[in-house]
Amino acid sequence: MRLDLLAHTLKQSLGILHKQDIQPVSSFLSTENAPNDILLGDDCAAMPDGDGYLLLAAEGMMPDFVESDPWFAGWSAVMVNVSDIYAMGGRPIAIVDTLWSQDAVLSQPLLAGMSAAARAYQVPIVGGHTNVRSRYNALSVSILGRAQKLISSFHAQPGDRLLMAIDLRGKLHHKYPFWNAATETDPIRLRADLELFPTLAEHDLCNAGKDVSMGGIIGTSLMLLETSKCGAIIDLDTIPRPPTVPFDRWLMSFPSYGFLLSVHPDRVAAVQQLFRDRQITCTDIGEVIDIPQLILKSQQGSTIFWDFDREHLTGFGNTA
């Protein structure tokens, strides 16, 4: 696909459009009396607590996903919350859920999926809210965690290298752009792979980071750059991907284990070795720059994909 057409396709993808839908919320929250030491726009709300931080996050599942694949929706609701906690250098403590279904029978696969993921990641589900007399089926999950040190999305620095860490040992969902490298994986390996992120945080190996979300690697890059008030040049030809997935679809995919890290050049080798030791791909895909633009380049040339002086994404970088 031509670079200009690829850029247009990505900008019109639901993953990025949904991130822009956050703008009214970011504008509203900027007028509230949030404590000055809590940055709005990270993967979790990080609240100073003693010698560390409490981490709080929540995720809602897409209604059609809940309807069409309830077991995997239940699993994913836990998995994405766990990922948010680890992405910030923390470890999960407990989960609560809000589950609405049309009857008790329809709630069972959602509960089974959540339970399976909670066992795999060893995070207890400790309560929540349930309604099995609803006119529709819906699920959201919230999580509490704790970190000694943080990996925030607010501290990328010009000159940093952008690393994409991803587990390519998976498969694409038959209907949704989800790269599943989790449900058939040994839970011990799942947890050990995620433990890399507290290690990165506690050894100051990473300036900033985010987990790759529904916006794909490009949308996630935009979110990190917006909150850090930086830009970047990303080389599309270096982005790791499975050979069986078309590149445009891959760029819009949400991996079960995918992270974007902003790392000082002197620490890149050490960070990559940590992932390599776990057989996880960790590739240098670009550089953070001091111009507020995301520039995509390939063998075809380059294009300004996003100019933050002209257009916000979530709006959080504008209010932080």
Question: Locations of the language-model features?
Answer:
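Acidic, Ser/Thr/Pro-rich beta/coil linker or hinge segments at domain junctions
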Residues: 2-3, 21, 278-320
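Beta-strand->loop->alpha-helix junctions that form or flank phosphate-binding loops
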Residues: 36-39, 131, 212, 230-242, ...
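Small-aliphatic-rich amphipathic alpha-helix that forms the alpha element of a beta-alpha
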Residues: 69-96, 109-120, 195-201, 217-223
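Short, compositionally biased
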Residues: 174-189
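Active-site-proximal betaalpha loop/short-helix elements
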Residues: 187-256
